């Protein structure tokens, strides 16, 4: 049976986005990136990164006198899992109500709709083969 990684909190996801952008980061790198948007303590960032390592999202390596961190899974894979977990938890596993909410709230652009149609066509053709 596949074991799921624990869900990311809002702050953890912020940290992961910084690391995915940079590839490899120190606590200071992440702290400075987050500090540009809001006030946060260095020790908070360090604690959160240690938690992310314990959860299995980050790998820590020593480089010179500092530790560097890198993601253990690609951003797309993590987000896919988060969306799947959200749909399961909120919509009992059905994506249809989610799509209806997005369409009703007009959060989907024409470009997004074109991309969705293209993906649906490709998915439908793949199932026919």
Sequence positions of predicted segments:
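Glycine-centered, phosphate/nucleic-acid-interacting loop/turn motifs that mediate DNA/RNA or nucleotide
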Residues: 56
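Short capping segments at the starts of secondary-structure elements
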Residues: 18-26
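Short, hydrophobic-biased segments on the C-terminal half of alpha helices
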Residues: 46-50
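Hydrophobic residues on short alpha-helical segments
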Residues: 13-19, 99
């Amino acid at each position: 049976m596949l074991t799921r990684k624990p869900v990311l909190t809002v702050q953890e996801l912020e940290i992961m986005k910084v690391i995915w952008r940079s590839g490899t980061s120190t606590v200071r790198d992440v702290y400075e990136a987050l500090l540009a948007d809001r006030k946060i303590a260095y020790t908070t960032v360090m604690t959160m990164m240690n938690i992310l390592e314990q959860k299995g999202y980050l790998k820590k390596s020593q480089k010179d006198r500092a530790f560097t961190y890198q993601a253990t899974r690609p951003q797309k894979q993590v987000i896919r899992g988060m969306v799947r977990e959200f749909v399961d938890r909120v919509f009992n596993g059905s994506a249809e109500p989610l799509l209806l909410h997005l369409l009703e709230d007009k959060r989907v652009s024409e470009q997004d709709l074109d991309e969705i149609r293209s993906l649906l066509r490709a998915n439908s053709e793949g199932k026919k083969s």
